[in-house]
């Protein structure tokens, strides 16, 4: 099990990201707009840098929904490899079974 504080910190980051997602996208699209003057674009970069760091998507860590484990994460199931192995072995995940050849 991951530390509860790590999981909560990650949840807080993801909520902040979702809250400021549109604002961040709008600023980035204006920054890359070549029709604006260099000075205007520079001011937009300053506005973007004033947004909280945790509102960036790169600060969010994918974690297992069951255990909170950050490594060995499978996006399709939103679980770590250990839990997938347990659930697949007991037949809880439909359509997933251990391969054999």
UniProtKB/Swiss-Prot annotation:
Superkingdom to which the source organism belongs: Bacteria
A biological-process GO annotation: translation
Recorded GO MF terms: rRNA binding; structural constituent of ribosome
A Pfam family matched in the record: Ribosomal_S14
Protein name, per record: Small ribosomal subunit protein uS14
Xref: SUPFAM superfamilies: Glucocorticoid receptor-like (DNA-binding domain)
Protein family membership: Belongs to the universal ribosomal protein uS14 family.
UniProt function note: Binds 16S rRNA, required for the assembly of 30S particles and may also be responsible for determining the conformation of the 16S rRNA at the A site.
First and last residue of the signal peptide: none
Keywords on record: Ribonucleoprotein, Ribosomal protein, RNA-binding, rRNA-binding
Cellular component terms (Gene Ontology): cytoplasm; small ribosomal subunit
Species: Orientia tsutsugamushi (strain Ikeda)
Phylogenetic classification of the source organism: Bacteria, Pseudomonadati, Pseudomonadota, Alphaproteobacteria, Rickettsiales
């Amino acid at each position: 099990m991951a530390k509860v504080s790590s999981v909560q910190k990650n949840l807080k980051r993801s909520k902040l990201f979702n809250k400021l997602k549109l604002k961040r996208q709008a600023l980035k699209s204006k920054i890359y707009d070549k029709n604006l003057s260099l000075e205007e674009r520079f001011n937009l970069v300053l506005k973007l840098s004033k947004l909280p760091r945790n509102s960036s998507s790169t600060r969010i860590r994918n974690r297992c929904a069951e255990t909170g484990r950050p490594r060995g994460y499978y996006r399709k199931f939103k679980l770590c490899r250990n839990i997938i192995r347990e659930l697949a072995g007991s037949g809880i995940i439909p359509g997933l079974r251990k391969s054999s050849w």
